[in-house]
Amino acid sequence: MRTSILSMLALGAAAVSAAPAAAAAPAELVERGSSCTFTSASAAKAGKKSCSSIVLDNIKVPAGETLDLSNLKSGTKVTFKGETTFGYKEWKGPLIRFSGKNIEVNGASGHVINGGGASWWDGKGTNGGKTKPKFFYAHSLDDSTITGLNVKNTPVQGFSVQADNLVLDHITIDNTDGDKTNGGHNTDAFDVGESTYITISNANIKNQDDCLAINSGENIIFTGGTCSGGHGLSIGSVGGRDDNTVKNVTISDSTVSNSDNGIRIKTIYKAKGEVADVTFSNIELSNIAKYGIVIEQDYENGSPTGKPTTGVPITGLTVEKVTGSVKSSGTDVYILCGSGSCSDWTWSGNKVSGGKTSSKCKNVPSGASC
């Protein structure tokens, strides 16, 4: 239904003459009907509402500025072309911002969005050192799609998703340049919060933190992903925010390699919230350094305490066909639950090996194994 609505909007937009664009130098804007090609961030910001189709052509975003595609008119299509780059400045970002309804964002053949992360990387991420800009805010980007983007070297976190009914398909993030000493840190690929009906499919991620982190939200799908170099596929940390519910999530048919963790759920010590009806299915792990499967209810200030609490129950969890290898120095499975706060779990077809068997699991629910 959404596809047909978008098609009707596009046909309607083509029949209507565009409103005059804000003044811009000829080199910065080429406008044909309601189709616009922008070659500067300032021209895009000034003229975006006059266009139903936008091409961002080799834009060099000035230091400390956002490539601002917020509040687009409904039905707008935006294409990244060539290389998009960003000047260096210590600030919080974001480097790119999109919002609107029925928006289509895509990348032309051969394009790259180069975050220039090496200019900021110092091995500390958001925990100190240089102030680093977040990369891409998809906030209030509803009933929309982001497809086929090629991203390189985000300074810290990649896509921040806070939206309703958003599809992100075939997103590539390559942060392998950050694997060096004092390189990238906290380079999460997708951080999802306060969102509903989000689908992330066919992602190809190489980074130094979570491939996926769902902090809150409902009806979320992650499928067909390839994750390497980071911290794996994560729910949480859950708790301590305005929205502390994660519900109806499916993470499936994906691979995690050369990462600290395979799959994990972490909830905040003494916080309140809920993790319900989460499924991990058909996940292949390889060369995992710390934990193949880790579920713990003891996080405080970003680190485990070893003392689980019960304020964020984990119920209706399904872990099935999670298989693969952990390094000998790692742990295959670790489950640390509060008394009675993990229940109604389904655990089947899982085979994680190569690491140690934990002696510290606690309150493991019926059916699960540790």
Curated annotation (Swiss-Prot):
GO MF terms held by the record: polygalacturonase activity
Localization in the cell: Secreted
Coiled-coil ranges from the UniProt annotation: none
PROSITE patterns: POLYGALACTURONASE
E.C. no: 3.2.1.15
Pfam family, one: Glyco_hydro_28
Protein keywords: Cell wall biogenesis/degradation, Disulfide bond, Glycoprotein, Glycosidase, Hydrolase, Repeat, Secreted, Signal
Disulfide bridge map: C36-C51, C211-C227, C337-C342, C361-C370
Gene Ontology CC entries for this record: extracellular region
Catalytic activity of the protein: (1,4-alpha-D-galacturonosyl)n+m + H2O = (1,4-alpha-D-galacturonosyl)n + (1,4-alpha-D-galacturonosyl)m
Domain of life: Eukaryota
Primary location group: secreted
Entry-linked PANTHER family: ENDOPOLYGALACTURONASE B, POLYGALACTURONASE
Family (UniProt): Belongs to the glycosyl hydrolase 28 family.
Name this polypeptide is given: Polygalacturonase 1
